[in-house]
């Protein structure tokens, strides 16, 4: 009986740690996919000199991700990237992590990349930002 009690106490201490690590891993996976998509669109930008032209070539540059490129497109998971090429020089991207956090980035050819995080999102409202975000990193 004492052994069962000790195991229960150890599980009670380990479970919150495990759940926190799982959430962090889900966030990092989504962020990594978003960075890969950014690298892909920058590669396309070098060829087309336009984010609008580059967004159409994303799936051939980085085929492991799925891209939603219409203006109202929303990410529905960590491997689906919502892309909004605002104009030739600016692009917004977003991805929904499994824990409901929408990770965003906005890249401007003139001023660089900014990042954002929005909690409590769903598959219908994790959309790419149309303007620069507030943070310079996650």
Stretches with model-predicted labels:
Residues 3, 18-19, 54-59:
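Generic detector of short, locally flexible boundary/turn motifs and exposed helical patches
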Residues 39-138:
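Periplasmic/extracellular, small/polar-rich flexible segments of pilin-like filament-forming proteins
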Residues 7-9, 35, 128:
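Alpha-helical interaction segments
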Residues 4-5, 30, 92:
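Intrinsically disordered, low-complexity segments enriched in polar/charged residues with Gly/Pro
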């Amino acid at each position: 009986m004492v052994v069962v009690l000790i195991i229960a106490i150890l599980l009670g201490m380990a479970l919150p740690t495990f759940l926190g690590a799982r959430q962090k891993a889900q966030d990092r996976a989504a962020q990594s996919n978003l960075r890969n998509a950014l690298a892909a669109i920058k590669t396309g930008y070098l060829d087309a000199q336009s984010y609008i032209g580059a967004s159409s070539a994303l799936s051939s540059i980085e085929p492991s991700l799925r891209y939603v490129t219409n203006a109202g497109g929303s990410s529905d998971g960590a491997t689906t990237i919502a892309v909004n090429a605002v104009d030739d020089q600016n692009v917004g991207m977003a991805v929904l992590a499994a824990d409901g956090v929408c990770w965003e980035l906005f890249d401007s050819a003139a001023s660089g990349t900014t990042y954002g995080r929005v909690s409590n999102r769903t598959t219908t409202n994790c959309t790419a930002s149309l303007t620069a975000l507030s943070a310079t990193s996650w």
